[in-house]
Structures are given as C-alpha cells and as structure tokens.
C-alpha cells in the first residue's frame, strides 16, 4: 500500500482500505475524501489467505490492480472531475 503522505507533504485523498470478510478473504475498497466528504468505492476485488506461493502472487496482482484504480481516482479528484 502507498504511504499516507504524497511527496509534496499533503495527505492522500484516496486510500486503499481492507475489510476482513467472514469467509477469510479480504475485500478491498477506496476511501475517498473530496471537498470534506468521505465516500467509499468498493472495488469487487478480494485477497485470499496466503497459504501458498500462488496465493501470494494472486494477491500481489490484485493489489497492483487496486493501486492502478486508486491512482486513477486520485487524478480525477485532483482535477475535480470526481462527483460525490
């Protein structure tokens, strides 16, 4: 996961968050702060319990997808295109 602060010292307004589900998987969602309002965007991406190398590789790929989505939303928020 990316660090809490950007290189210019401001806090990020879009963060990847995780929520543990009852079946043992972990759901990923974005926590978006825009104009003082917090919204959540659930990504429908899930991490598996890391029991094998294949699970670890799968989770790395899913986190990479989530990071790509996060950076796209960050750009949208910064350019004020994101509607809450």
Tell where the protein language model's regions lie, with residue ranges.
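Basic/aromatic DNA-contact patch characteristic of tyrosine site-specific recombinases
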Residues: 1-84
């Amino acid at each position: 996961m990316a660090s809490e602060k950007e290189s210019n010292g401001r806090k990020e307004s879009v963060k990847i968050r995780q929520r543990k589900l009852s079946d043992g998987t972990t759901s990923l969602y974005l926590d978006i702060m825009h104009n003082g309002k917090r919204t959540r965007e659930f990504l429908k991406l899930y991490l598996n319990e890391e029991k094998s190398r294949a699970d670890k590789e799968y989770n790395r790929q899913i986190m990479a997808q989530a990071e790509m989505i996060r950076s796209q939303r960050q750009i949208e928020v910064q350019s004020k295109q994101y509607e809450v």
